Amino acid sequence: MTKREIIYQVLEKLNIHSDDSKLSEELVSSLIDTKRALLLKQQYATKGWHMPSEVKQELSIAVELIDRVAGYADAGKVLATSISLPESIKIKGKEGPLLVRKTDNTEIPLTLVAIERVPYLFENKYTQHLTYCAVDHDGKLYLMSKDNKLRFLKSIRVTDIYEQPDVARQYESSIDLSLEVWDDNYPMEASMVDTVVELVTKDLARTLSLPADNVNDASDGRG
């Protein structure tokens, strides 16, 4: 389902026309993102690595070799994304990207660490062969390996669940440029749509101080 279809469902339940100046579609869009994130956090609080494919987005991000990150200096051994990644949904047990791949779809086995641990990664001889991944406070992703085996990469594919799918979409690996962002498939399970519509509708009804009988009930056959 597209976000535009979800927006129209909300407007229909509120008996508001899309050109009504009291309510912008952008506000409805933002609330849809917020409620989607809330439901995903609740539903997958204990199984952050078992997200359904429908809610994921794979982004293609350029990377570059840098000499320093968070006080860690080791020329040519730190690969960083050229931009800060879009904000991901924070779920317990999922402390970083769900998957990082090369452009040929080969998965890069990564050990996720806190950015504060970067200066000490290769001190242990038993773990220094691992490839590490860290995300800094600005959202940049860093890949580090002692043998510098990733130095020739120019871009990577990062799969995650993003708070604002519309923002993340501009970096997606496969995107239909002929579609407006709201006319593309929205990354949400079909089973979650009705709940999101209901939550957004209730929030907006309170905000707009609509009388109870002005809001279509889901049981009226149109929800």
At which residue positions do the language-model features occur?
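Glycine-enriched, solvent-exposed interface loops adjoining structured elements
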Residues: 1-223
